């Protein structure tokens, strides 16, 4: 659950993770293969704080890679605080609720390329995990993995197919092979 809160004179997003909403076995695969978290013991009692730390770490990586995403502010146990993407009236809409054009498509593909160039794969990219507020922002990054993860290639392929299918439904001509080639281009 994500809430809007006030810090000083600015809005922030406060994301609270609950064990009841996290499926231990399904998220374990995103942590165990990620070398950045290889020294962390993972059991049912520790999974939520590890998942929060993983999202914070991935947000930091995207900030360093200049990929638009909420700026991480801090975390504690099951709580993550980050910059708020939206206005006084409400949060920025998910991409699924935005009028889509080729410029938005280009921003998404460019963001995927920047992530890949910085050895990051979102691993759950879809129209639900991107916001639009003057530009595209990538969100929900706890499952994002480093390129050394044994399933990184599979996750990247799934992201490419999801993105391609979404934009095709909105009349944008896409080709997963060309997307893959562009993302991996040095």
Swiss-Prot record:
List of catalytic residues: 124, 140
Residues holding Mg(2+): 129, 140
Entry similarity comment: Belongs to the protein kinase superfamily. RIO-type Ser/Thr kinase family.
InterPro entries assigned: Kinase-like_dom_sf, RIO-type_Ser/Thr_kinase, RIO_dom, RIO_kinase, RIO_kinase_CS, Tyr_kinase_AS
Catalytic activity, as annotated: L-seryl-[protein] + ATP = O-phospho-L-seryl-[protein] + ADP + H(+); L-threonyl-[protein] + ATP = O-phospho-L-threonyl-[protein] + ADP + H(+); ATP + H2O = ADP + phosphate + H(+)
UniProt cross-references to PROSITE patterns, sorted A to Z: RIO1
One term of GO molecular function: hydrolase activity
Protein name per UniProt: RIO-type serine/threonine-protein kinase Rio1
Binding of ATP, residues: 15
Function: Despite the protein kinase domain is proposed to act predominantly as an ATPase.
EC id: 2.7.11.1, 3.6.1.-
UniProt keywords, alphabetically: ATP-binding, Hydrolase, Kinase, Magnesium, Metal-binding, Nucleotide-binding, Serine/threonine-protein kinase, Transferase
Pfam families membership: RIO1 (PF01163)
């Amino acid at each position: 659950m994500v809430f809007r809160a006030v810090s000083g004179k600015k809005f922030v997003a406060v994301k609270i993770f609950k064990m009841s909403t996290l499926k231990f076995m399904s998220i374990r695969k995103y942590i165990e293969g990620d070398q950045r978290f290889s020294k962390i013991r993972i059991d049912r009692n520790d999974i939520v704080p590890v998942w929060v730390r993983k999202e914070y770490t991935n947000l930091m990586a995207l900030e360093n890679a200049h990929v638009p995403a909420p700026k991480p502010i801090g975390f504690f146990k099951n709580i993550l605080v980050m910059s708020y993407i939206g206005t006084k009236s409400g949060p920025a809409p998910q991409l699924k609720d935005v009028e889509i054009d080729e410029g938005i498509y280009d921003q998404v593909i460019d963001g995927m390329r920047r992530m890949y160039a910085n050895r990051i794969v979102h691993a759950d990219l879809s129209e639900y995990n991107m916001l639009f507020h003057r530009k595209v922002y990538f969100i929900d990054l706890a499952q994002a993995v480093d390129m050394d993860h044994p399933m990184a290639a599979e996750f990247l392929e799934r992201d490419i197919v999801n993105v391609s299918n979404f934009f095709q439904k909105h009349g944008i001509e896409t080709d997963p092979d060309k997307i893959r080639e562009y993302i991996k281009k040095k």
